[in-house]
């Protein structure tokens, strides 16, 4: 991570901008959803508004545009934590602004794609388990979510 985050004097203005940009995130497809998550997450962590918990808060908040538009959340697996931290650190070392350009998000977005694929596997396994239970009990339920929303 960088040696220095924005000063506490800069944080309110940066967070105002973050909130303004965050409010406009409305992904229409999988690629946009990944990019929205990446931009929201990277910029929040780069602003670093709290003494502790910025990564946890970024992971939570970055999922809201996805959930709001019918996508499942991106869950970063514990086993990928080192790669996650390394990618954020690499971004922050090369950036002069906490707000990433689209091209700067490519490595993090590729990482998120892998993590989201694992999330889909968890969702599909849960749907399979539910379907099997319904079949055994004779109850019909909704069809599983489609991955290509």
Located regions from the model:
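FIC/Doc superfamily catalytic core
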Residues: 1-149
């Amino acid at each position: 991570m960088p040696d220095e985050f924005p000063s506490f004097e800069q944080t309110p203005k940066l967070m105002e901008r973050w909130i303004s940009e965050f409010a406009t995130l409305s992904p229409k497809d999988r690629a946009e959803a990944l990019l929205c998550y990446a931009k929201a997450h990277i910029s929040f962590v780069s602003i670093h508004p709290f003494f502790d918990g910025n990564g946890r808060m970024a992971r939570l908040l970055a999922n809201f545009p996805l959930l709001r538009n019918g996508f499942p959340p991106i869950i970063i697996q514990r086993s990928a934590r080192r790669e996650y931290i390394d990618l954020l650190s690499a971004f922050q070392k090369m950036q002069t602004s906490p707000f990433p350009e689209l091209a700067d998000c490519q490595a993090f977005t590729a990482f998120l794609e892998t993590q989201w694929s694992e999330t889909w596997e968890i969702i599909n396994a849960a749907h399979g388990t539910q379907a099997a239970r319904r079949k055994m009990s004779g109850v019909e339920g909704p069809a599983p979510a489609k991955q290509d929303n």
